[in-house]
């Protein structure tokens, strides 16, 4: 039972206890506020430095006051003991018939009785007297007063014939606390007579405590005033900076008319004017760029529409000539075939330009229906399969055994897949192209993997640029226009999906399309890894990464790739 109780106690108040978690939360909150608030740092640093200065000054001033008060006390005590020596000498030397003990007691009573009078006490204040004649051989010491309160070190000086003083804590009938003890040899006929005066430091201690309390109170008030001053001063700087930050955020959101108010002619006013000048320049340039972009989009759209009419006429004439190409000279027949092929490519380019202009104008719309994406993949393969056959490239397809129903625009998704497969065929270098599909509860992914030339670092983003080509000298077998991947990524975004690329020179490349199964949902993960898992060489031989150990490595890589998503 006892061990169980200890375990429960550690569980409650240990590292994972509520107190520790609460302290951790407070620490994180303070750290966050310290990092994010310039005003907090300024006020805290001002208070810290001010506190250090006040403590240093307080220590110096307190030391000076203490030393001054004690110096005055010592000076008055020395004057008092000089007068006491004369009094003691007169009493001890007055009547020889009196015993030594009686003489010492009479002298002590005479000295202490004078302290009851303000005029007799002088500036040294009240005191108690101690008189002592050390013993000599069998004769015991003769004393008067609390001799046990006199420090032995002070007695050593007095025995040597020197006047001295020492601070000590005394405990007498009338006082208990710090005191100043002054000792001196007495001038009398009695040999080795020692005189000590004990001056309580009660009043001096009260004076010093009053000074310390006053300084502490004054320091606390000064700290509060300095905190308020630092807060007001820092606010004069922080408020315009915060205003500039808020206006910059609104400016970045598209509110191009936002400006900072200009007040006065100081540094903050110059900052506001510079910010407004910058905002005005950026607003003007952004407006110009928007106008140029709109003009470019209108030009592309208008040219595409205007070219469609003459293209239709030329197409009709070319088809008519092509239908009678058998009756023409072989040279003319070949020219007719080339003309028809180029017209097909030109018509495809116009269609792509029109599609791009729709995306740029934000008028592209989805025609969503619930379909089995496996049939969409098969349809895309049937459209570009002849390209693989002509190039002697094997298409390896892995599709799920069960239906993959998704709410998509079939035409756009098929166009994405068609572009990806055609692009892979163009860069496969006569090696197989692998198409895989996988789905989870929320998303579906299709990867198109080739083992051709691959991509250099940084080209994963460039491949989706318009008219971009990694190698301009490479011939497109698919007859593409250079806009296929640019349109594909726009179609993927229209579905709130993702289209990503990966590649390494000489290893190949992989394109992954990830779409939500339900329209309107966002893609956060993908059921297929981006970086392909090492596979056996497409040429038919075994790659170096074979064997049981490498199989385990591939499994770990697959797990790591899926977790990284």
From Swiss-Prot:
Bias class Basic residues marks the residues at 1-13
Membrane topology of this protein: Multi-pass membrane protein
Q: Which SUPFAM superfamilies match?
A: ATPase domain of HSP90 chaperone/DNA topoisomerase II/histidine kinase (SSF55874), HAMP domain-like (SSF158472), Homodimeric domain of signal transducing histidine kinase (SSF47384)
Q: Name one GO molecular function term.
A: phosphorelay sensor kinase activity
> Major place of localization?
membrane
Q: Locate the compositionally biased regions of type Basic and acidic residues.
A: 550-565
Domain (HAMP): give its ranges: 235-287
Q: Where in the sequence does UniProt note compositional bias of the Low complexity kind?
A: 538-549
Q: What reaction is this protein's catalytic activity?
A: ATP + protein L-histidine = ADP + protein N-phospho-L-histidine
The transmembrane segments are 42-62, 213-233
- PROSITE patterns reported in the protein's UniProt record: HAMP, HIS_KIN
Q: What does this protein do?
A: Member of the two-component regulatory system MtrA/MtrB. Seems to function as a membrane-associated protein kinase that phosphorylates MtrA in response to environmental signals.
Query: What name does the UniProt record give this protein?
Result: Sensor histidine kinase MtrB
Native organism: Mycolicibacterium paratuberculosis (strain ATCC BAA-968 / K-10) (Mycobacterium paratuberculosis)
């Amino acid at each position: 039972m006892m061990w169980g109780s200890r375990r429960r106690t550690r569980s409650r108040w240990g590292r994972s206890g509520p107190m520790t978690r609460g302290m951790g939360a407070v620490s994180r909150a303070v750290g966050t506020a310290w990092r994010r608030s310039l005003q907090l740092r300024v006020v805290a640093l001002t208070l810290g430095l001010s506190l250090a200065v006040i403590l240093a000054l307080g220590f110096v001033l307190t030391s000076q006051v203490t030393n001054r008060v004690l110096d005055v006390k010592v000076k008055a005590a020395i004057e008092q003991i000089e007068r006491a020596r004369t009094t003691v000498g007169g009493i001890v030397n007055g009547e020889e018939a009196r015993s030594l003990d009686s003489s010492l007691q009479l002298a002590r009573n005479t000295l202490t009785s004078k302290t009851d009078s303000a005029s007799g006490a002088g500036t040294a204040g009240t005191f108690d007297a101690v008189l002592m004649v050390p013993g000599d051989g069998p004769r015991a010491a003769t004393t008067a007063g609390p001799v046990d309160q006199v420090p032995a070190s002070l007695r050593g000086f007095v025995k040597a014939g020197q006047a001295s003083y020492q601070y000590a804590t005394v405990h007498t009938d009338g006082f208990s606390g710090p005191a100043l003890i002054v000792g001196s040899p007495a001038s009398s006929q009695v040999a080795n007579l020692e005189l000590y005066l004990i001056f309580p430091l009660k009043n001096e201690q009260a004076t010093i405590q009053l000074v310390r309390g006053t300084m502490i109170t004054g320091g606390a008030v000064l700290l509060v005033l300095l905190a308020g001053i630092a807060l007001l001063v820092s606010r004069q700087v922080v408020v315009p900076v915060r205003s500039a930050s808020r206006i910059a955020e609104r400016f970045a959101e598209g509110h191009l008319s936002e400006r900072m108010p200009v007040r006065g002619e100081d540094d903050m006013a110059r900052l506001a004017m510079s910010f407004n000048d910058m905002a005005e320049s950026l607003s003007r340039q952004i407006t110009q760029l928007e106008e140029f972009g709109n003009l470019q989009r209108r030009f592309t759209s208008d040219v595409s529409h205007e070219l469609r009419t003459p293209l239709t006429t030329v197409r009709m004439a070319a088809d008519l000539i092509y239908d009678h190409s058998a009756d023409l000279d072989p040279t003319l027949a070949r020219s007719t075939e080339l003309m028809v092929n180029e017209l097909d490519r030109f018509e495809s380019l116009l269609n792509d330009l029109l599609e791009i202009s729709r995306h740029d104008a934000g008028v592209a719309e989805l025609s969503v229906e619930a379909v089995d994406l496996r049939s969409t993949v098969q349809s895309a393969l049937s459209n570009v399969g002849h390209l693989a056959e002509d190039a002697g490239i094997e298409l390896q397809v892995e599709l799920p055994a069960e239906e993959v129903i998704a709410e998509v625009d079939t035409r756009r998704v098929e166009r994405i897949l068609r572009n990806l497969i055609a692009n892979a065929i163009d860069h496969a270098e006569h090696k197989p192209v692998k198409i895989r599909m996988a789905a989870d509860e929320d998303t579906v992914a299709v990867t198109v993997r080739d083992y051709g030339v691959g991509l250099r670092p940084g080209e994963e983003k460039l491949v989706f640029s318009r008219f971009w080509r990694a190698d301009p000298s490479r011939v497109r077998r698919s007859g593409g226009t250079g806009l296929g991947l640019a349109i594909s990524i726009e179609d993927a975004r229209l579905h709130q999906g993702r289209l990503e690329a990966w590649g390494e020179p000489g290893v190949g490349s992989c394109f992954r399309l990830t779409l939500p199964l339900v329209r309107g949902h966002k893609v956060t993960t993908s059921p297929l890894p981006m970086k392909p898992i090492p596979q056996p060489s497409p040429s038919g031989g075994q790659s170096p990464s074979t064997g049981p150990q490498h199989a385990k490595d591939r499994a770990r890589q697959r797990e790591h790739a899926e977790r990284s998503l």
